[in-house]
Regions:
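Detector for methionine-enriched segments
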Residues: 1, 27-29, 87, 93
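Non-catalytic peripheral regions of patatin-like phospholipases
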Residues: 3-41, 48-50, 58-74, 105-164
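Short linear motifs in intrinsically disordered
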Residues: 41-49, 81-86
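Short, proline-enriched alpha-helix->beta-strand connector loops that line the catalytic pocket
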Residues: 49-53, 96
Length: 164
């Protein structure tokens, strides 16, 4: 989905807005205005579907991936989506069921093992880097992670070791 209308864009360009919302991305736009107003989401069809749709989130307390879904509650489903999209530092953590979560890519960038364990024999993985690319290991940025997430040492560990 490409949004060309400036008033419906989800990237915060105004420094004041970034500071106030503590986010580079307007997550309220994406998870409140888009599904209810701008690009209406058919929750009834989604909830009635027999297909499973797990979203990967990273538990900030444990630093581990969790695979969540909701088939009844719109707000909880959108909270799971928001958490799954909340890039550390760029977006705030999201609380679900009393736990804080961020983007699932921190703990499980490509959840192929989960997919295989849940019975999916065929998987499509779309690479967004050149063939052979490997993320460099290192602790670059760890000071920022420690400062931002000092209450969550397991999340810091997951962020620093993400390339492994």
């Amino acid at each position: 989905m490409i949004v060309t209308d400036e008033k419906n864009r989800y990237v915060n360009k105004n420094i004041k807005t970034i500071v106030e919302k503590k986010a580079l991305l307007d997550m309220d736009m994406v998870f409140e205005r888009y599904p209810y107003e701008i690009f209406p989401f058919d929750f009834d069809t989604y909830f009635a579907s027999p297909q499973t749709c797990e979203l990967v989130v990273t538990n900030c307390e444990t630093g581990r991936a969790e695979y969540l879904d909701d088939r009844e509650n719109k707000e909880r489903l959108l909270a799971i989506g928001r958490a799954s999209s909340s890039m550390p530092i760029a977006c705030p953590m999201v609380e679900i069921d009393g736990n804080e979560y961020v983007d699932g890519g921190v703990a499980d960038s490509i959840p192929i093992i989960r997919s295989l364990k849940t019975g999916h024999r065929k998987n499509v993985i779309i690479l967004t880097r050149n063939f052979g690319y490997r993320k460099k290991e290192g602790t670059r940025g760890w000071e920022l992670y420690v400062a931002a997430f000092r209450k969550y040492p397991n999340l810091v560990r997951a962020l620093v070791n993400r390339a492994k």
